[in-house]
Amino acid sequence: MAAKDVKFGRDARERILRGVDILADAVKVTLGPKGRNVVIDKSFGAPRITKDGVSVAKEIELKDKFENMGAQMLREVASKANDAAGDGTTTATVLAQAIVREGMTAVAAGMNPMDLKRGIDIAVGKVVENLKARSTPVAGSSEIAQVGIISANGDTEVGQKIAEAMEKVGKEGVITVEEAKGLEFELDVVEGMQFDRGYLSPYFITNPEKMTVELENPYILIHEKKLSSLQAMLPILEAVVQSGRPLLIIAEDIEGEALATLVVNKLRGGLKIAAVKAPGFGDRRKAMLGDIATLTAGEMISEDLGIKLESVTLAMLGQAKKVTIDKDNTTIVDGAGSAEEIKARVEQIRAQIEVTTSDYDREKLQERLAKLAGGVAVIKVGGATEVEVKERKDRVDDALHATRAAVEEGIVPGGGTALLYATKALEGLKGANDDQTKGIDIVRRAIQAPIRQIAANAGHDGAVVSGNLLRENDENQGFNAATDTYENLKAAGVIDPTKVVRTALQDAASVSGLLITTEAAISEKPDDKPAMPPMGGGMGGMGGMDF
């Protein structure tokens, strides 16, 4: 086992604080509408230019092991804020640096670290209450667009595209971000439920130009098992033919003879039919077939439920306004399912999301939720160069997470003013002793740091800006760094999601509290052995080999 290097007390805290400062100073230059870019060198390819706080934080690794501990703890703050709200990483980093600095100064002056931490926790709870009380729900797509614009550093097109996508697929819908081939932003929206299974035979195609199957007002047979023979299906097939409507069969698989029979019937014109494989695998397949059944007001034909193919009636089949199938995807538009049943199914999936511990399962459940509740939108981000596309994609991702957070918990005035005005909630608040009261005071000063940094990045004195605002009575009044003016920020569209501001503060306080209460730090000692000498070059005694 390698020898360890152990640092205690002030020495440990000072080393850790140096690491915190290095990471925070690199991240905080990106804060606000006039924040600067950071260039990150890559071991291969072009350098990456970004204004995304968490991307900068993830790249920082320091040589000194103790300084690196501080940097990595602060990186954890940015990552946690990113995971919880998807944005606010730079704000969280600035807050954490401010709390750690003030806290370590207080500890060096002889205060009890545990009481300081208790005071910090009391103050954070009070500020969170204040933020929730002042939060207002998002009203309409113009405010959604505005949140996106602010998060994307004033890029109007980004905010508008996100608002448009949310309008089309609903607030629960899936919105993904991809890189485009061209220069422009594009928005592709798939309405209805889409799953990644195409037609089983090209003979089912009804639109040769687009190479798609289009079924208007079809019945949908949802079968859990394989179909190898159509014998059991004959009664339901005859009923569908008599109804004069098309039929879509969704089954685990349709094998040789059964598929050949369907194709022959389709080609002879007696049966408007198409067949696709069921989406997913194992238990997830069952769940997705259940979703399709709910959406189309059909029943899943499963022997587990005691339903056999021979006894299926038209009433058991699902229905939809239109089904479109290409070689890769099937889209069901406007299923006949009742709103109440779909809502109940959505709530059931939501409950599963709450209890699952697996990120993969959560992602798949959210996909199912979106397919039931709304649809899928893809924002394609274009640009002149690969570097520009990646930088814009970072900003679109941030903006998308921020708008989702705004829809979830509402909005507060932006630009760091929500936290600045929350200092008023801490006035006169006392802890159980002087050290706890000092902890409350640390938070009161720290929550002024974001607005000071935004002002500093815009070329103003942060202390003057925060002082001017604290004299204001209207809490919507703030400093708009984009235009260098004091104005009503809500009216000017400078707004932040409450969830982003709240999680930034809670995550910053959580990690800062741990750093302040650190009394010893242990790291592996560097190896003192000299490096091995390089291998000797050439192969001696091999003369006469000059060709």
Curated annotation (Swiss-Prot):
Keyword annotations: ATP-binding, Chaperone, Cytoplasm, Isomerase, Nucleotide-binding
EC number: 5.6.1.7
Functional description taken from the UniProt entry: Together with its co-chaperonin GroES, plays an essential role in assisting protein folding. The GroEL-GroES system forms a nano-cage that allows encapsulation of the non-native substrate proteins and provides a physical environment optimized to promote and accelerate protein folding.
Pfam families noted in UniProt: Cpn60_TCP1
GO CC term (a single one): cytoplasm
InterPro entries: Chaperonin_Cpn60_CS, Cpn60/GroEL, Cpn60/GroEL/TCP-1, GroEL-like_apical_dom_sf, GROEL-like_equatorial_sf, TCP-1-like_intermed_sf
Name the UniProt record assigns to this protein: Chaperonin GroEL
Encoding gene (name): groEL
PANTHER family attached to this UniProt entry: 60 KDA HEAT SHOCK PROTEIN, MITOCHONDRIAL
Catalysed reaction equations from the record: ATP + H2O + a folded polypeptide = ADP + phosphate + an unfolded polypeptide
